[in-house]
């Protein structure tokens, strides 16, 4: 998929780029797979801000995605490739031979008219989903389960893929996009191929207004706040931080500070961390 540039008729247009959406085949989503999505604006159930800089944005509906891919041995034909405002990857509407319709994460190269299928006896081709024990070593995969039957949780964003490196006993070794090597149970499912929209990471937003349409609000630097609002605030003019290192609004180190729990249950499954040399 290509990226479109614009003539520099305004300062923001000079830098802006946008996907060409040449893979998209339908503008109208399947109504039976839509649900209302209330804007949370970064608030939790108590109304407190848990994610800063969120709010506003264009109204959107949530598309119900089939991450489990548990409709085995029934072929499904790809009806449309669609844009999903809730994720970076494109989605595909598939129609099973029994008439049921579902959305799936569209892998790269999937086209309208292609036939996909789930189950342990499926062929190794993009879009098919099967347990890791039935996938050959070296295969590129995405939408990977961490628990059998729970649905894919890993490698779902645009252009990403993991690789099946080895299988031993009850576990398969995967290399994730971050560089992390980890064990996953071999009965967990994954989908063959790479996630669609690989050029998503080189798109330049170009202007603040386009970011506001996505539901992001401005970020204010701590150094221009008052001292009661941020540890970096206060002072006359441009003042230094006044601490050994920059900190968050709540006083914790902001750069290079490890926030992962050091006794997390999944540590036993991680062979090599994403930051390991």
From Swiss-Prot:
Position of the signal peptide: none
Its biological purpose: One of the primary rRNA binding proteins. Required for association of the 30S and 50S subunits to form the 70S ribosome, for tRNA binding and peptide bond formation. It has been suggested to have peptidyltransferase activity; this is somewhat controversial. Makes several contacts with the 16S rRNA in the 70S ribosome.
Pfam families: Ribosomal_L2, Ribosomal_L2_C
Gene Ontology CC terms: large ribosomal subunit
HAMAP family: Ribosomal_uL2_B
PANTHER family named among the record's database cross-references: LARGE RIBOSOMAL SUBUNIT PROTEIN UL2M (PTHR13691:SF5), RIBOSOMAL PROTEIN L2 (PTHR13691)
Binding partners and assembly: Part of the 50S ribosomal subunit. Forms a bridge to the 30S subunit in the 70S ribosome.
Stated name of the protein: Large ribosomal subunit protein uL2
GO BP field: cytoplasmic translation
Stored InterPro entries: NA-bd_OB-fold, Rib_uL2_dom2, Ribosomal_uL2, Ribosomal_uL2_bac/org-type, Ribosomal_uL2_C, Ribosomal_uL2_CS, Ribosomal_uL2_dom3, Ribosomal_uL2_RNA-bd_dom
GO molecular function, one term: transferase activity
Region of interest: Disordered: 223-261
Domain of life: Bacteria
Keywords for the protein's UniProt record, in alphabetical order: Ribonucleoprotein, Ribosomal protein, RNA-binding, rRNA-binding
Family under the similarity heading: Belongs to the universal ribosomal protein uL2 family.
């Amino acid at each position: 998929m290509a990226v479109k540039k614009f003539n520099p008729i305004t300062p923001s247009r000079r830098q802006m780029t946008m996907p060409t959406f040449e893979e998209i085949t339908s503008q109208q989503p399947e109504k039976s797979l839509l649900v209302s999505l209330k804007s949370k604006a970064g608030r939790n159930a108590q109304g407190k801000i848990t994610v800063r800089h969120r709010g506003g944005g264009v109204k959107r509906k949530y598309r119900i995605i089939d991450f489990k891919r548990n409709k085995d041995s029934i072929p499904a034909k790809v009806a449309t490739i669609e844009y999903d405002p809730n994720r970076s990857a494109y989605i595909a509407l598939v129609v099973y031979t029994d008439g049921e319709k579902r959305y799936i994460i569209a892998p790269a190269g999937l086209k309208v008219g292609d036939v996909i299928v789930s189950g342990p006896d499926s062929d190794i081709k993009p879009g098919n989903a099967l347990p890791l024990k039935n996938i050959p070593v070296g295969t590129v995969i995405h939408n990977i389960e961490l628990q059998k039957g729970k649905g894919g949780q890993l490698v779902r964003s645009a252009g990403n893929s993991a690789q099946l490196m080895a299988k031993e006993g009850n576990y398969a070794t995967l290399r994730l996009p971050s560089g992390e090597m980890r064990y996953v149970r071999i009965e967990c499912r994954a989908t063959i191929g790479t996630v669609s929209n690989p050029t998503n990471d080189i798109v330049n937003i170009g202007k603040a207004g386009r970011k506001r349409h996505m539901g992001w609000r401005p970020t204010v630097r701590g150094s221009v706040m008052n001292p009661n609002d941020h540890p970096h605030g206060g002072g006359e003019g441009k003042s230094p931080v006044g601490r050994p290192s920059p900190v968050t609004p709540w006083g914790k180190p902001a750069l290079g500070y490890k926030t992962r729990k050091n006794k997390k249950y999944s540590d036993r499954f991680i062979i090599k961390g994403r930051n390991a040399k």
